[in-house]
Amino acid sequence: MARTKQTARKSTGGKAPRKQLASKAARKSAPSTGGVKKPHRYKPGTVALREIRRYQKSTELLIRKLPFQRLVREIAQDFKSDLRFQSSAIGALQESVEAYLVSLFEDTNLCAIHAKRVTIQSKDIQLARRLRGERG
């Protein structure tokens, strides 16, 4: 464990004023007004881990079909206008895109872990793509 420098601190000395103690006791004994219960919150990371397990078990497509279809058609227009797609072709494209993204994020996570981090950053994606031999 790293050592830390000790610094002198002024001691306040004496006891706390009586007013503070009296107000604390009054707050404890007084009934709570409103009765509004705070919503339950999980610890940070708990929900994320639950979602990771859920999505690793599932096999359904995670990108919505219509937005993906619009994106494919928009990109295809740059190459040739009035292209038509079979629905199975768009489905196959979406399957391959999602498989590619999942494997890219797996490699990206390994790059972040190698750098002793738990948060992925853009430089991890760049390194993963560079190691795969992808450019552009």
Swiss-Prot record:
Region ranges (Disordered): 1-43
Record GO cellular component, one term: nucleosome
Record PTM: Phosphorylated to form H3S10ph. H3S10ph promotes subsequent H3K14ac formation and is required for transcriptional activation through TBP recruitment to the promoters.
Signal sequence, start to end: none
Positions where N6-methyllysine occurs in the chain: 5, 10, 19, 24, 28, 37, 80
CDD domains with a match to the protein in the record: HFD_H3
Residues modified as N6-acetyllysine: 10, 15, 19, 24, 28, 37, 57, 65
Entry annotated with the keyword Phosphoprotein: yes
A GO term, aspect molecular function: structural constituent of chromatin
Any one Pfam family match given in the protein's UniProt record, by short name: Histone
GO biological process, any: rRNA transcription
Phosphoserine sites (modified residues): 11
KW Nucleus (keyword) present: yes
Subcellular location: Nucleus; Chromosome
Chain's role: Core component of nucleosome. Nucleosomes wrap and compact DNA into chromatin, limiting DNA accessibility to the cellular machineries which require DNA as a template. Histones thereby play a central role in transcription regulation, DNA repair, DNA replication and chromosomal stability. DNA accessibility is regulated via a complex set of post-translational modifications of histones, also called histone code, and nucleosome remodeling.
Subunit structure: The nucleosome is a histone octamer containing two molecules each of H2A, H2B, H3 and H4 assembled in one H3-H4 heterotetramer and two H2A-H2B heterodimers. The octamer wraps approximately 147 bp of DNA.
Family: Belongs to the histone H3 family.
Name of protein: Histone H3
Source organism: Phaeosphaeria nodorum (strain SN15 / ATCC MYA-4574 / FGSC 10173) (Glume blotch fungus)
Lineage, opening ranks: Eukaryota, Fungi, Dikarya, Ascomycota, Pezizomycotina
Gene expressing this chain: HHT1
